[in-house]
Regions:
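Conserved NTP-donor binding/palm subdomain of two-metal-ion nucleotidyltransferases/polymerases, i.e.
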Residues: 14, 24, 89, 119, ...
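A basic- and aromatic-enriched beta-loop-alpha substructure that forms the phosphate/nucleotide-
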Residues: 61-140
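Catalytic metal-binding acidic patch
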Residues: 33-74
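Helical scaffold of the NTase/Pol beta-like nucleotidyltransferase catalytic core
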Residues: 1-30
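Acidic, carboxylate-rich catalytic segments that either coordinate divalent cations
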Residues: 239-263
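A structural signal for short, well-ordered beta-strand segments and their strand-loop junctions
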Residues: 28-31, 100, 170-172, 177
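Soluble or luminal CAZymes and related metallo-dependent hydrolases
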Residues: 6-11, 79, 83, 113, ...
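Conserved nucleotidyltransferase catalytic core and NTase-mimicking acidic/glycine-rich helix/loop elements
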Residues: 116-246
Length: 263
């Protein structure tokens, strides 16, 4: 089954099934992970992430209610969603994963106004220091687990490399990093030889299966290790001061989209 059939038929159908089964209204549904980054393999899963509002009754319980949905379909479509209030609380805390959601280049559905409204607020709530900690943790995790010799899954090396390059973007520009890996490489890698080696790995990844092992070029490997060590030092020197923001605008957005969808 080709990707266009997934995007245009299967995924919209699954989103409708989620709304019916869980009695919710989806505000935003996007692709996350390797397909959004642009280094999916031939057999990569579909990782959908979504934001939703519940039926009116959900909002009138004195007990805390479950505010997440996770559902795996048998055709390798994996969905995970957050209720709008949870999503906004994480947005307020500068959650890097949520910022990736709202900047995903693959949007399956967006409620009119929601995506633009949330993006107008991101300058107040995005904190590069928190993002640096997050992506530094990602590449250190993949380094500790997988990078002991040059032969390793391409997927893991690209995860590792992406974490490093996001830290470089954050250091150089201090803004929300691009989701597409090629955009990140173009903006942060000036050495043409290294850039060409990354492009070659990316091509191999797209042509291979998810867990294929391929040798990583030693020059690229050494370059990445050097960058990783440098940004480890940058992160260790950070002294983040995240000031508390008032919730008025987020509360208003929450009220507006809940009210709009439960009338």
């Amino acid at each position: 089954m080709d990707s266009e059939q997934y995007k245009n038929v299967i995924i919209p159908s699954h989103l409708h099934e989620i709304e019916e089964q869980y009695k919710v209204k989806i505000l935003l549904a996007v692709e996350s992970g390797s397909r959004a980054w642009g280094f999916e393999s031939k057999d990569s899963d579909w990782d959908l992430r979504f934001v939703y509002v519940q039926e009116p009754e959900w909002y009138f319980h004195i007990e805390e209610q479950k505010d997440t949905i996770e559902h795996m379909f048998p055709d390798e479509v994996d969905l995970a969603g957050w209720e709008l209030g949870k999503a906004l609380r994480l947005f307020k805390r500068s959650n890097p994963s949520f910022f990736e959601w709202i900047h995903s280049p693959i949007v399956y559905y967006a409620d009119e106004g929601f995506l633009s409204d949330i993006k107008t607020l991101e300058g107040r709530y995005f904190h590069k220091e928190k993002a640096m900690y997050h992506y530094n943790h990602i590449y250190k995790k993949h380094n500790d687990r997988y990078i002991e010799e040059f032969g390793l899954p391409l997927k893991r090396f690209l995860y590792y490399l992406r974490g490093i390059l996001v830290c470089k973007w954050l250091t150089d520009f201090g803004t929300v990093p691009p989701v597409r890996f090629t955009e990140l490489v173009d903006a942060t890698v000036s050495d043409k030889t290294i850039k060409d080696k990354i492009a070659h790995l990316l091509k191999l990844k797209k042509q291979s299966n998810e867990h294929n092992q391929e040798p990583v070029d030693k020059e690229l490997f050494d370059w990445a290790q050097g960058q990783a060590e440098y940004y480890n030092g940058v992160v260790e020197s950070l002294r983040p001061e995240i000031k508390a923001e008032k919730d008025d605008e987020l509360n208003a957005l929450y009220y507006r989209f809940v009210h709009k969808n439960i009338e």
